[in-house]
């Protein structure tokens, strides 16, 4: 299935929105500060989304610039409008918003369908699977509004145990895939006769979940942002290696760390019964070396900081409640996905190191899978650009330019590279 056309849906949507704007004689709209309203606010050729941020609000421009609403912010809220740079008034765009509840595996989940006002039979519809954060996504993140602002209908829902949804928070991927399938059925029901193609997008941990759900959900395509094609154990080991290499350690220390992560993996999948003696031995062997205290990974750092007795008796409650299924093998899952896939990688991702994932994706393409792979340089997890200090710490600055365009264009079957500085792999 070819998903390249000549003009991106994101660009086409902005041109269409700008068509009725009289640039020669702009209408002056008085601005009075007021309470922020979640949604999309449009200028002639750009837009900004307003979402909730804890007790406050956050803005995100269509090019990825973002910040908190507050004193001195670039964006101020008014009734049905926002003021940008204290001089430009952008009006709220009309959207059809439908709140709903649906059931998955006996649990009530909260969802929201956001559609452009003129959504019709050719409008793409996507459902979003978010990452591991214990945060409901309804009205809280920019992604749904970035899609809707580009003419794509989008269904977002709060994962079980988060936001408005019931149930217990989980990182059991098959269970979360079942929830995604249920969300897909609900999205299609609500948008009946007002959508064309249907896709799933997963971000971070959602990149493990979307492929599990793709066939049952009836997806025409899938998109993954900063996900992994390694399992949870491999992710942990990759993170540990990256941490130590960034700290300046070489292959000798990496080999020692590999001994450690092999043992922590055995402990994790066995419920802390297989490897306790080996853990004690390695803690004694390497515990006084400088690199040992730097190990974090996904879970290895916590295990290494515990005694074997404590681990065997008490486990790790913060992990044990997650109901993790350690058996999922992403390559096996992806071999069963028979629709086009988009993978967008952050080159300098510390949470999801990309080297192995890229290698695996290229192997899948070699097996005949329809994959488009884009990598954005100088970005970290979440497609964030950053400033890095001399100590290696990073301050996240903005979502990289054209990332959101790429996602929406994929949904609209209208990819048109290049996307800023991204590399097509």
Identify the residue ranges that each predicted region occupies:
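Conserved alpha/beta-hydrolase
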Residues: 147-164
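N-terminal cap/lid segment of alpha/beta-hydrolase-fold proteins
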Residues: 29, 83-119
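Accessory cap/linker subdomain of secreted extracellular hydrolases
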Residues: 225-333
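Alpha/beta-hydrolase active-site loop
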Residues: 170-190
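Conserved alpha/beta-hydrolase "acid-adjacent" motif
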Residues: 350-356
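Short beta-strand/loop motif that positions the catalytic acidic residue
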Residues: 337, 343-345, 349
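Short beta-strand element of the alpha/beta-hydrolase
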Residues: 121-131
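The serine-hydrolase catalytic nucleophile loop
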Residues: 131-145, 159, 355
């Amino acid at each position: 299935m070819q998903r390249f056309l000549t003009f991106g849906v994101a660009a086409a949507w902005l041109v269409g929105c700008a068509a009725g704007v009289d640039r020669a004689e702009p209408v002056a709209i008085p601005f009075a500060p007021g309470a922020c309203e979640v949604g999309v606010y449009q200028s002639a050729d750009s837009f900004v989304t307003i979402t909730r941020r804890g007790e406050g609000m956050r803005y995100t421009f269509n090019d990825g610039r973002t910040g908190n609403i507050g004193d001195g912010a670039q964006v101020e809220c008014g009734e049905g409008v926002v003021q940008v740079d204290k001089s430009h008034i952008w009006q709220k765009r009309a959207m059809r918003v439908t709140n709903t509840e649906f059931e998955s595996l006996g649990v009530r989940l909260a969802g929201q369908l956001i559609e452009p006002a003129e959504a019709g039979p050719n409008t793409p519809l996507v459902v979003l699977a978010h990452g591991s954060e214990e945060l409901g996504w309804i009205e809280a993140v920019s992604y749904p509004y970035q899609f809707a602002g580009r003419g794509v209908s989008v269904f977002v829902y709060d994962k079980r145990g988060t936001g408005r949804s019931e149930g217990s928070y989980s990182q059991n991927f098959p269970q979360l895939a079942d929830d995604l399938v249920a969300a897909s059925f609900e999205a299609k029901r609500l948008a009946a006769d007002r959508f064309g193609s249907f896709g799933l997008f997963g971000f971070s941990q959602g990149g493990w979940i979307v492929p599990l759900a793709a066939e049952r959900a009836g997806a025409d395509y899938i998109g993954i942002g900063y996900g992994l094609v390694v399992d949870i154990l491999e992710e942990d080991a990759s993170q540990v290696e990256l941490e130590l290499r960034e700290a300046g350690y070489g292959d000798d220390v990496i080999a020692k760390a590999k001994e450690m992560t092999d043992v922590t993996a055995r402990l994790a999948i066995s419920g802390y019964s297989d490897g306790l003696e080996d853990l004690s031995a390695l803690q004694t062997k390497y515990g006084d070396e400088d690199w040992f205290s730097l190990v974090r990974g996904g879970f290895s750092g916590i295990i290494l900081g515990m005694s074997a007795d404590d681990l065997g008796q008490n486990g790790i409650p913060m992990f044990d409640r997650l109901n993790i299924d350690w058996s999922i093998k992403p390559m096996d899952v992806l071999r069963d996905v028979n629709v086009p896939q988009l993978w967008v990688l952050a080159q300098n991702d510390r949470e999801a190191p990309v080297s192995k994932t890229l290698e695996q994706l290229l192997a899948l393409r070699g097996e005949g899978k329809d994959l488009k792979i884009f990598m954005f340089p100088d970005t970290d997890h979440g497609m964030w650009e950053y400033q890095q200090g001399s100590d290696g710490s990073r301050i996240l600055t903005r979502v990289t330019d054209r990332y959101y365009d790429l996602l929406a264009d994929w949904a609209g079957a209208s990819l048109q590279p290049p996307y800023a500085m991204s590399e097509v792999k």
